Amino acid sequence: MINAKKLYNTILNDSRITDLVKVVQDAYPETIEKFPCVIYLDENQTDIEFADNLPQGDSIAVQVHIFTKALKNYATTSEIGLKVAEVMRENYFTCRNNREVEDIDDNVRHRVMYFTREVFS
């Protein structure tokens, strides 16, 4: 199996994303204090394409959560999402879901994106 977290970390710390957001992290904090932020979670990683009973690759999936404030001078979830999608696609990920999520706080906007990719040894 490949180290998917290392792969996501490299991709999501691309300057096109970090220029728009204050925080990129790989775990959900108890409370989000700095906006905008990107949180990525390793959703699933499975073996694929076996030869001689050994996996020849991985199918990996990642969830990307984008949080921002609905205030002036904050990048929107759409602006950040477009950059995330651009960087992920350049790294051969397919976006299989991209949606705005309702949040309790009126000033907070939340977008969830799901990406998948197959990686072969």
Task: Walk through the language-model features, giving the residues of each.
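Small/polar-rich, solvent-exposed N-terminal microdomains that initiate assembly or binding
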Residues: 1-54, 72, 80
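Short C-terminal domain-edge/linker segments immediately following a structured domain
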Residues: 53-55, 68-74, 94-99
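Acidic-leaning, charged glycine-interspersed low-complexity segments
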Residues: 82-121
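An anionic, turn-rich surface loop/hairpin at beta-sheet edges
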Residues: 77
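Oligomerization/assembly interface segments of phage tail-like spikes and tubes
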Residues: 56-70, 109-119
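Short, low-complexity, polar/charged sequence segments that are solvent-exposed and flexible
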Residues: 42-46, 57-61, 83-87, 115-116
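Glycine-rich loops and low-complexity Gly/Arg-rich segments
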Residues: 48, 62-67, 88-92, 121
